[in-house]
């Protein structure tokens, strides 16, 4: 089916609205005229031609303004019939029928079926070929309406339209005499490129033809025969065409030349018609990490006062010639803009001049009473900030072109509106370009669009910030900010290289310093834009852009104060009259407290008193009330939060936490209720988006700054309970998310590696009170809320964040409640709930108070095994993780003095767990990594009573084969690491027939292969560690096998620096440490028959081995690995143990191997002792 073009004034990418019903009179009129048209027969007489003319005129003049309602097939049939009645030699009738096609398809918004589309395209193409040139404009309009979104259905006509001598190619050529026809042809091409989701795209060769045509148009200057407005429309169509190719056509800009040429024309078009700016761009922009045009080093983000003053003076002169009509004329096309938003910031205005307290420079009156606002207007406006805005007197002007007249704006205003649309089109096209290329490619052009120094007016210094600060159209400013946000999104890795430096004596500016300067300049410009903007929509975009910048900038590598400036500037806007501004302000605050948390600078900001940085300003700049006016949270009786409701040692509470709590739970103030479009009628609370954002900020604080949040633990508990009692599922959900973050923060405090002093932790008895209140409140209801599975799943996650030390002290009924609910929800049909439940059970099974409960562990095992069979990969992945945890619990229970757990744990269940783990080891990597971990633990846990049973023999063999295949297969590195670790666990079980079983040689062969050749050094390390686990010589198998393992480790030591991946080098030392440990371990177990083989290896590689063992004795592992022997005494002791063992080995007379190996080890000890100044006994007491 073919979609058709909307009204010509709409952008060609805008989707068609659903047809609306015609009034009965209109419907009757259309049917009556259609019937008359169908009754006519082809006739070349003058009377017949006059009748067709009249009918066409009536059909064209019929009022279709209310939309569709006529059946699409009736419209298609009528248009086909109309074309059949008009021979191509009748130019006037052809022109009239094309007007009819254009009118009906635009106004009635019908879908032309494919056969009729084919006929109508054939007719219009023939008309272009045969009719007089004066008809081409109307024919092209009809053709544009027909091909709209139908490029893929015009395949047979594309050679005629877009071929080398195609009609559209000829008519759009720069050499064509009629500029209007040229523009209409480009419009047709743009419509051809537009595609509908789910339908085929325009074929690739034609995509490139169109792209090159559009690019040529954008690169070409305005011809002398073309007026400014037609030129703007031509540029708009070309930009829309490229945007359609990038969006719907999924065109990829793989060639640097194509991308560079496109970015060059987009940058030029971005500034098209911008007052006071006329830049010349190179034909192609080339990617470069440094500024392309000059090598200026970053300067301080401010200009001399004289520069600013001169700029202001010059602008003021131009300011006077702008008329009120002009401004209204431009405004006419900006339907979505606010009247007071068109103001600019002086490019030289420093951050200090921007007034950190939130007081800002404002335009003294809205457009219409003064001319175009300019730099000087903004700077001078500081003195007039108290003057009221006359926004209430503003009347919006219709956007229809026919409404323009000299009295309402004139041609100059109309032209400015079209120029603004070109800039907006260029920015929209740039946004599509950003989405169609990889970020690493985009960042090569960073310096072309993002400033790194205050702008000086040269072409290389203009950037997206130029538009944000200087463009008179709020919509264009918002578009520029959207593009900048898209560039900043996901830029964390790129920006992470930034580094501030105070070294000004370098001969060149390092890339890291350039990026740091760019980040500073973005902060400066965005804060300038913030204080100078009064359009709420654009203001929202500025704050969102700031939030994106804050989320990605590496503040831990930059000088302090950047976040402080953002923090102080944004504070007033959380009381703005527009709810979207308030929400985005909270989003920005959330970004500040979540970026690289915890940051010392943010920690200090959180401790600021409520009144810090707040001041009153004009009504356009919102402000916080004084501390006396702050909302206060009522004391909760049930939780006794008085002990923690305010910061200890602080005179005032954390203003951000107080703000968020009051936003969530207290009625809104009248001052903020004026434009809360999103709030429910009669609602006493802040709008939902505001409350949700406040809850997210609290969650960020709990995650990154728990030491601050913990002071409000009980009060936040009240907030969570209130949220979960509300009817809005989103509020409930975010309340539960906050609970989960608080629980995670409490757990983090009590981890063994926590650096929080015991006296600074929340006392366990208080955590018990907190969780008892949660479990006595609405949390159980949320857990059973089957109609809201997302809420249910989050409640399960929250339940898994209970501090283990507190769980054991909870009332017995609350413990039973948690366990019963989780085991019950494991049967849920919803995969989100089931995944969360599986994970929660995996957490509970590690709790010290539960892990020795055989019944609970068995029930959990059965629940997890059931989830491992689920269709959802996410459920299976969580279940496999929990199975790994459960098997960790089995291993922990082996070390307890009481053997009752092992005796009581069901052998049948153990068998079932092994079978499920084997099956899971063949699943996706997410499942497999934990399945092999579980297999290793299960095989380690097996008791002699299990191994002796015939039914276990086969499953043990299968389990080990599953591990071996995982070790050697090219799986994800995490999977192979876990498999090697699991193999080491298997080797720890003395009940298994390691050394005699057939699988022994396969297991060692797999591990030695990995330790020698695996690309990932962490996997090699784990393999070497596994090879040093067996504690008896017999477990290594035959003589040949022992020597193979020894030789493989020597080879691995020799290759320990052979890698092409730079990231692996940091693991080299740790790998050598583990290999040296394994070699010394083998020497400490070697038998007399093994020594000759070892001696042969030492003859070949003795010097290399000696140097690495000496290095091992001296420095040890550089990696953080729990299996490494770190202390010097322990490392030396390993050599002594090996030496003592070799000395005790009984060898045959004449065997020189024993003496050679002893001499090798003694030499190592001697050299080590000489270098470290120690004295060491080479022979033990048994040598006497």
From Swiss-Prot:
Region entry Disordered, spans: 292-345
Biased composition (Polar residues): 303-312
SUPFAM superfamilies membership: ARM repeat
Residues in the signal sequence: none
S-S pairs: none
Compositionally biased residues, Acidic residues: 332-341
Keywords, ordered alphabetically: Phosphoprotein, Repeat
Sections of the chain in a coiled coil: none
Gene3D superfamilies: Leucine-rich Repeat Variant
Repeat (HEAT) residue spans along the chain: 159-198, 455-493, 517-555, 561-598
Modification Phosphothreonine occurs at: 621
UniProt-recorded name of the protein: HEAT repeat-containing protein 6
Originating species: Mus musculus (Mouse)
Gene name for this UniProt entry: Heatr6
